[in-house]
Curated annotation (Swiss-Prot):
The keyword Nucleus does not apply. HAMAP family: Ribosomal_bL33. Transmembrane segments: none annotated. It holds the Pfam family Ribosomal_L33. Gene3D superfamilies: Ribosomal protein L33. InterPro entries: Ribosomal_bL33, Ribosomal_bL33_CS, Ribosomal_bL33_sf, Ribosomal_zn-bd. It is found in: Plastid, Chloroplast. Belongs to the bacterial ribosomal protein bL33 family. One of its GO terms (cellular component) is ribosome. Keywords: Chloroplast, Plastid, Ribonucleoprotein, Ribosomal protein. One of its GO terms (biological process) is translation. GO terms for molecular function: structural constituent of ribosome. It comes from Phalaenopsis aphrodite subsp. formosana. This is Large ribosomal subunit protein bL33c.
């Protein structure tokens, strides 16, 4: 049986471009993705290039706190 905290946790990735701009004026919203990460293999914050439907391009999505 596993002891201690769960190794795999659910994290939320948020578009860093939308956050910096203060959200687009035409379409209100910030692009977010939900994924999992392994705490032992990746203790640092995740960053992926994903498509942002509000910016209409591929941008860096970084992990945020819950």
């Amino acid at each position: 049986m596993a002891k201690g905290k769960d190794i795999r946790i659910i994290v939320i990735l948020e578009c860093t471009c939308c956050v910096r701009k203060g959200v687009n004026k035409e379409l209100l919203g910030i692009s977010r993705y939900i994924t999992q990460k392994n705490r032992h293999n990746t203790p640092n914050r995740l960053e992926f290039r994903k498509f942002c439907r509000y910016c209409q391009k591929y941008t860096i999505h970084g992990e945020i706190k819950k």
